[in-house]
Regions:
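Carbohydrate-interacting regions of secretory-pathway proteins
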Residues: 21-458
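Bacterial Sec-dependent N-terminal signal peptides
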Residues: 1-26
Length: 458
């Protein structure tokens, strides 16, 4: 009997130590996408760059005046984890790995389109960022995760990991987490290896190397990411469990005015604003500032924070997101605060006023101009994403579509000097409140907002 009881105890202990096959599964097997000898399973498409196998490596070689070239899998993949090693010869070009991508010979003039994980050996150092080839362009520039810019090593093989599960894409370079994108397009597509177009003889003949290419497609489990990685979330008015777990909150729920009020009282404006189809929109009053519904502000106050928001301008429109708004000034027009300018730079006259462009899109209004490139600005009528980070030490940054466009030290001597020569010099201690409301401005033009999210920093 003692022996039987001992055996029973051992059985029970072993049973509970075993993985529960009904609730947890090991990841499925890895499948090689490259046999080390041939290009079987791959097709060449778009461009004229050369692809061949050398010493167990796929080698792509640039060709002058060719468009972007791709070696793509014959198979289409939905959810997967992809790993490979890559090396690039030239620092004047770039490359990338297409994921869930497509080829449309008619509508896209024979071009590949879809998400691309960047290989960028330039001084910009955006390797591991996510680019939408031949469509929306940059989804995840590495200004959003500057610490990862040093992950890619020039002149040597770099291990790249890409995880596509559900509508999420995560990337790693040499085991360093880089990008996190939640998207609304392309749940499946091919995998591709890019050789970028070149236009000079000096750039021609440069090589890109790919090896150890393998994929996992079954029993997948999302990998953990550190708490401080910013998520580009293209699902309107939605937070992922990751974002919620790390302190993000929606300031606009997509349905109601909960959390917002008029600067003129404790209720939301009865006119001048509308909430419909997941948007909060300030309506036109023919450019008359605060003459219709007036500005709206959050009910809560914020001190150090990271706030991002999508905005869509109509032609010639002007608005803004202000921060550290106290409402103490009791102004008749728009309330006073530091302002992330939201503006149609081409059609609104304010873009030509102020000093050195400090009233243009994404600028710190009337104080610091945004240093931005046209190609990172989405057209009027399309969505752009603004972002403001105020750190606990009063360092402040503005971003436009994931690219940092300015930074400053709130309360510094330089800041005080800028205020002294601005329209705000009549307000004592302008911009220096310990905490304040977040404000959406009524400047008399129709502008829509969505996906307004905030994380308090400590």
């Amino acid at each position: 009997m003692k022996k039987l009881n001992l055996l029973l105890c051992i059985y029970v202990i072993c049973f509970f130590m075993m993985p529960d096959c009904t609730t947890a599964q090991s990841p499925g097997p890895w499948h090689s996408l490259f046999d080390g000898k041939t290009l079987n399973g791959w097709n060449r498409t778009a461009g004229t760059a050369d692809y061949k196998v050398e010493n167990g490596v796929i080698v792509g070689t640039t060709v002058i005046n060719s468009g972007n070239s791709f070696l793509v899998t014959k198979e289409v993949y939905r959810d997967f984890v992809l790993e490979l090693d890559a090396k690039i010869e030239s620092t004047e070009s770039n490359s990338g790995i297409q994921i869930r991508s497509h080829f449309n010979g008619e509508g896209h003039q024979g071009k590949v389109y879809g998400q691309q994980v960047e290989i960028d050996p330039s001084n910009r150092n955006w390797s591991g960022g996510v680019y939408d080839e031949d469509r929306r362009q940059w989804l995840y520039p590495l200004d959003l995760n500057a610490k990862a810019k040093t992950a890619f090593k020039i002149g040597q093989y770099n291990h790249i990991k890409i995880e596509c599960i559900g509508n999420e894409t995560k990337t790693w370079i040499n085991e360093i987490p880089v990008a996190y994108v939640v998207d609304t397009l392309d749940r499946e597509g091919f995998v591709g290896l890019q050789v970028h177009a070149v236009t000079t003889q000096e750039q021609a003949g440069k090589k890109v190397y790919f090896k150890n290419i393998r994929i996992q497609t079954s029993s997948l489990k999302p990998s953990a990411f550190p708490a401080d990685i910013y998520v580009v979330n293209n699902v309107p008015n939605f937070l992922t469990p990751y974002e919620k777990a790390h302190g993000w909150k929606l300031l606009f729920d997509g349905k109601t005015a909960a959390g917002w009020k008029s600067v003129k009282g404790e209720t939301f404006p009865a006119k001048g604003w509308k909430i419909t189809d997941g948007l909060i929109t300030v309506l036109s009053s023919e450019g008359k500032e605060a003459a219709n519904g007036g500005d709206i502000v959050t009910r809560d106050l914020y001190a150090a924070f990271d706030v991002s928001f999508d905005f869509k301008l109509t032609p010639g429109a002007n608005s803004g997101l202000k921060y550290f708004v106290t409402l103490d000034e009791k102004t008749a027009g728009s309330a006073i605060g530091l302002e992330y300018q939201v503006l149609d730079d081409d059609l609104h006259p304010d873009a030509k006023l102020g000093r050195n462009g400090d009233r243009t899109l994404a600028s710190l209004y009337d104080l610091i101009p945004a240093n931005k490139q046209k190609r990172f600005i989405h057209p009027i009528g399309e969505w752009n994403t603004g972002r403001v980070i105020v750190y606990p030490n009063n360092h402040v940054e503005h971003y436009l579509n994931g690219v940092k466009v300015l930074e400053y030290e709130r309360g510094s001597k330089d800041f005080e000097q800028l205020v002294s020569i601005s329209k705000y010099n009549v307000w004592p201690n302008f911009g220096m409140a310990k905490a304040g409301h977040i404000l959406l401005q009524d400047h008399g033009n129709q502008v829509s907002f969505r996906s307004i999210k905030i994380k308090e920093l400590h």
